[in-house]
Amino acid sequence: MAKPTKGKAPRRSRRNISAGRAYVHASYNNTIVTITDLDGNSVAWSSGGTIGYKGSKKGTPYAAQLAAADAVKKAQTSFGMAAVDVIVRGSGSGREQAIRAIQASGIEVRSIMDDSPVPHNGCRPKKKFRA
């Protein structure tokens, strides 16, 4: 005869994270916003695609704004995050709007840093990216 189940396992208590980092990866095709704790462990993320946009609409500033607001909302409700350092990578059209959305969402922005990868004259760019 089968043993009866013991019921649900106890829920883990909510980790309270007061500060973290918001990484904004802004490419020409999409904008991905990831919220991490100070150790770099991912807490919440969102992108133009997870908001519901497809194709070229994912790269728009409005999609970046919604993605940033969604990621911050997840981090605030799940972990009680109150302050972030914003780190921006890439030169897509959504980068400024994502920063503005993070600032407007009620979370304290302690610093903004641009960490865009810049080649030291590496590979030859494609035809459309050459000046």
Curated annotation (Swiss-Prot):
InterPro entries: Ribosomal_uS11, Ribosomal_uS11_bac-type, Ribosomal_uS11_CS, Ribosomal_uS11_sf. GO terms for biological process: translation. One of its GO terms (cellular component) is cytosolic small ribosomal subunit. Gene3D superfamilies: Ribosomal protein S11 (3.30.420.80). GO terms for molecular function: rRNA binding; structural constituent of ribosome. Part of the 30S ribosomal subunit. Interacts with proteins S7 and S18. Binds to IF-3. Belongs to the universal ribosomal protein uS11 family. Located on the platform of the 30S subunit, it bridges several disparate RNA helices of the 16S rRNA. Forms part of the Shine-Dalgarno cleft in the 70S ribosome. This is Small ribosomal subunit protein uS11. It comes from Deinococcus radiodurans (strain ATCC 13939 / DSM 20539 / JCM 16871 / CCUG 27074 / LMG 4051 / NBRC 15346 / NCIMB 9279 / VKM B-1422 / R1). The lineage of its organism: Bacteria, Thermotogati, Deinococcota, Deinococci, Deinococcales.
